[in-house]
Amino acid sequence: DKIDEIKRVSALSAPVKYQLKDNKVIIDFPKDFNGKKLTGEALLYCPSDENRDIRQTFSILDEPLKMKVPVTKSGLYQLQLSWQDGKTSYYFENKIFLK
């Protein structure tokens, strides 16, 4: 369940890192996932207006996840990541301000 998925993220060797650059949110997963294919969904959830949500499914291997963000979508969001490394599920969320 989600509580276990959050605990698994806390137990990783490093935190999930993200940054906003060139109208993209770039998400770096810890080295624990090197050589593992990650599949899942990323959501930029806008609490004030669900029509501003940005959702993206992904499948990556040893690369950062890049989410395009339209310039019209500035404001406070919650970054929600749900992913699997083939056998184990993980969940991460944090607030992010898009400019």
Q: What feature does the model see in each segment?
A:
Residues 1-22:
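Transition segment at domain starts
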Residues 1-3, 58, 86:
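Generic hydrophobic, helix-prone segments enriched in Leu/Val/Ile
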Residues 7, 16, 31-33, 68-70, ...:
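Residues embedded in well-ordered secondary-structure elements
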Residues 9-11, 51, 89:
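Short solvent-exposed loop/turn micro-motifs enriched in small/polar/acidic residues
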Residues 13-15, 22-26, 64-66, 91:
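Intrinsic-disorder/low-complexity, polar/charged segments enriched in Ser/Thr/Lys/Arg/Asp/Glu/Gln
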Residues 25-80:
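Structured, soluble extracytoplasmic/luminal domains of envelope-associated proteins
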Residues 59, 95-99:
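Short beta-strand edge segments in extracellular beta-sheet folds
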Residues 84-92:
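Short acidic/polar inter-strand loop motif in beta-rich domains
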